[in-house]
Design a protein with these regions (language model features):
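A glycine-rich, hydrophobic loop/mini-helix early in the fold
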Residues: 57-105
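Compact, glycine/acidic-enriched structural inserts
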Residues: 78-89, 209-233, 238
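N-terminal low-complexity or amphipathic/hydrophobic leaders
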Residues: 11-77
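Short helix/loop capping segments that flank catalytic or ligand/cofactor-binding pockets
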Residues: 57-58, 127-128, 171-172, 190-192
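A hydrophobic, small-residue-rich beta->alpha segment in the mid-to-C-terminal subdomain
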Residues: 184-227
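Histidine-centered divalent-metal-coordination microenvironment in nucleic-acid enzymes
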Residues: 175-183
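Long, positively charged binding patches that form subdomain-scale interaction surfaces
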Residues: 99-164, 171-173
Length: 241
């Protein structure tokens, strides 16, 4: 099996509880991976990393490439290798997509491992969200999203869906289950995905057997009580429910 590492910046629980300061820059992040997802300082948009480029989806759904100097409070990336390929045709919704991916990784005895999946193809519809940066610190992710989150839809779009899977026992380090971000092939639209309808696409699946977590290295990080974020709160901010 290929020995591959997930490089993660901070933890989802820290982000949910309001730690959205810069931990690393985009330039540093891309040294550790070419595919993944995350967000930017102050929760300033949704991050999509694919093919070695880092894109930021703003709260109107438009996308631009992030500069190397842009701050990153939370992200998870890996260096993709040639992994298992899975043909996807006529996927009506995100539940069916997650089910297909679950079956694929279960067949490889991987439900207790991390995975990164890159799906490229034609999407009939993508339901997504993003948000704008909130400058104050110690503001929970739930409150930031309540103030600045916008939802939008993309129809008949060719693009890339980046899917990150963490097993249930890693809850708090990251979101258990599947976390999906999208960017179109023309790099004009994207965001955090709530639902998707796939015409036809190809998924490439990488199993991850190692994690390297870069925690914030400043006194302010130790002022956060990271036991407070409940599973329900994490689910709400990740799934919009």
């Amino acid at each position: 099996m290929k020995n591959n590492t997930m490089y993660q910046v901070s933890t989802l629980q820290a982000l949910v509880l309001g730690y959205s300061r810069t931990v690393v820059t985009v330039g540093e992040l891309l040294k550790h991976g070419d595919t993944g997802l995350g967000t930017f300082e102050g929760v300033g948009g949704e991050m999509i990393v694919t093919d070695g480029h880092c894109y930021c989806a703003a709260n109107d759904g438009t996308v631009m490439e992030a500069s190397d100097e842009t701050g990153v409070p939370f992200a998870a990336v890996t260096k993709m290798y040639e992994g298992r390929r899975l043909e996807l045709t006529g996927i009506p919704n995100i539940e069916e997509l997650k089910s297909r991916l679950d079956i694929a990784i279960e067949e490889d005895f991987g439900l207790n491992s991390m995975h990164v999946v890159r799906i490229k193809g034609k999407f009939n519809k993508v339901s997504a969200r993003s948000e704008s940066a909130y400058k104050a610190h110690h503001v929970s992710l739930k409150d930031i999203l309540a103030k600045s989150q916008k939802d939008f839809y993309f129809d008949n779009t060719n693009g890339t869906l980046v899917c990150v899977y963490y097993p249930d026992y890693m809850d708090g380090i990251n979101a258990p289950g599947w976390h999906l971000h999208f960017v179109s092939d023309d790099h004009r639209c994207g965001g955090h995905v709530f639902d998707v309808n796939i015409d036809n696409a190809v998924a490439e699946i990488n199993k991850i057997n190692r994690i390297d977590i870069q925690l914030p290295d400043e006194p302010a990080f130790d002022t956060y009580s990271l036991k407070q974020a409940s599973q329900d709160e994490i689910k709400e901010v990740e799934q919009g429910k």
